[in-house]
Amino acid sequence: MNEDDIDVNTPSPARIYDYWLGGSHNFAVDREVGKRAAEAMPTLRAAIWANRAFLRRVVTHLATELGVDQFLDLGSGVPTVGNVHEVAQAANPAARVVYVDIDPIAVAHGRRLLADDDRATVIQADLRRPADVLSRPELGEVLDLGRPVAVLMIAVLHFLPDADHPGDIVRAYRDRIAPGSYLALSHAADDTDLPAEQARMIEEYQKSTKVPFIHRDPDELAGWLDGLELVPPGIVLTNQWHPDEEASRILRTHGVVARKP
């Protein structure tokens, strides 16, 4: 990683998220934004951990119930507790995982974490360029795209404005993965009935960063998944997706897993 690649003056979603989770891989500018957002929404950290719980449930279900042993985690962020490879390999020691993030700090720490694991790696790439991501030699060294793979887009697509055409991005990954593969995503729910404190948090976040935060409704998400079979219970609030504990209702996000026939 080249130090010139690291912008310490611009907040990064990956590093802000790391700060909220209590991590140390962040800078003063990230902590300042994260602190103001958390002050606007005191329950924010609990909601962030609830999102991690959703990711864990998805990976566990895919590995144990649906037989998936390959995972591609897009916008994976800074490594923290409950990483995909830890959850997947606990269910199936042969599971293989590739992480993708654009943030050089996230990638550097991911590579350090995975240095001794030949079944997992991290790639610095832009998830908005599916053809580039899927053609990377490093990815091909870990994943066999001729076999089913689970593509994870957890809490990342709401950072993409409509100008980035997130639906087209999702469909591009769909078209390039093998039959029997899965797409899993979570996304901030539409803001028509948003809790007041979450609305304040998002307003504070958007004032402080250059990164958008877009709410979208379930019908739009469903359109992104055309041609796929939704795994029951379909598109629901994440706390309702195969809950195995008291799931948080604080942060309104929808989640879904879909299979490519």
What are these regions, as identified by a protein language model?
Residues 1-125, 129-131, 135-143:
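Rossmann-like AdoMet
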Residues 125, 148-157:
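Residues lining the SAM
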Residues 128, 157-159, 188-193:
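Short "lid" loop at the C-terminus of a central beta-strand within the Rossmann-like core
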Residues 130-134, 159-172:
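A short, conserved alpha-helix within the catalytic core of class I
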Residues 149-153, 169-170, 176-188:
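Conserved beta-strand signature within the Rossmann-like core of class I S-adenosyl-L-methionine
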Residues 197-217:
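Conserved Class I S-adenosyl-L-methionine
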Residues 211-235:
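Short alpha-helix
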Residues 234-236, 240-261:
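Core SAM-dependent methyltransferase catalytic element
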